[in-house]
């Protein structure tokens, strides 16, 4: 129930999308990262929202890094100069993972993890969410599990 509440809060209140609150967790897996371990740059095409819950962090566990989609713009584009660094104009944002914390982000957002330090470990549970009903105003469709 808690994960569902976090999902709907993120999708509806944070991102501002119109959606039902009901969702499926389509995938869920445990990550145990030993010293020097990392995750390469990737996204989750099978999810509207992805997330990671940090179960145990020890030593220098390495943060999750989110890449700004604007850092690889489609051409042509208009370049601008950064006035002050924000989450919207930086090339990437450090997710600063913390034990007991759940991070949610759009599933299509490229991300990776920094390597864990010596004598460090990071244990997390990652997941992907899909809404039970997709709606685009005049039409909608339901997602079912088989």
Segments the model singles out, each with a brief description of its role:
Residues 1-10, 136-146:
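N-terminal leader/capping segments at the start of a protein or of a new domain
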Residues 1-37, 41-43:
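Signature of the catalytic double-stranded beta-helix
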Residues 33-104, 134-143:
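Catalytic core of non-heme Fe(II) oxygenases with the double-stranded beta-helix
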Residues 39-42, 111-118:
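Short beta-strand His + acidic residue motifs that chelate non-heme Fe in jelly-roll/DSBH
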Residues 51-53, 119-135:
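A short hydrophobic beta-strand segment most commonly corresponding to one strand
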Residues 91, 118-119:
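A hydrophobic alpha-helix/topogenic segment detector
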């Amino acid at each position: 129930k808690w994960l569902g509440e976090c999902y709907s809060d993120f999708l509806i209140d944070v991102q501002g999308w119109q959606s039902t609150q009901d969702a499926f967790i389509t995938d869920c897996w445990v990550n145990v990262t030993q010293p020097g371990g990392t995750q390469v740059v990737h996204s989750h095409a099978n999810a509207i929202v992805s997330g990671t819950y940090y179960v145990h962090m020890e030593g220098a566990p390495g943060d999750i890094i989110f890449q700004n989609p604007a850092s690889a713009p489609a051409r042509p584009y208009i370049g601008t100069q950064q006035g002050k660094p924000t989450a919207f104009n930086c090339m990437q944002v450090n997710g600063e993972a913390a034990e007991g914390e759940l991070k949610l982000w759009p599933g299509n957002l490229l991300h990776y993890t920094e390597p864990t330090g010596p004598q460090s470990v990071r244990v997390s549970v990652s997941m992907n969410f899909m809404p039970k009903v997709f709606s685009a105003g005049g039409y909608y469709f339901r997602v079912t599990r088989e």
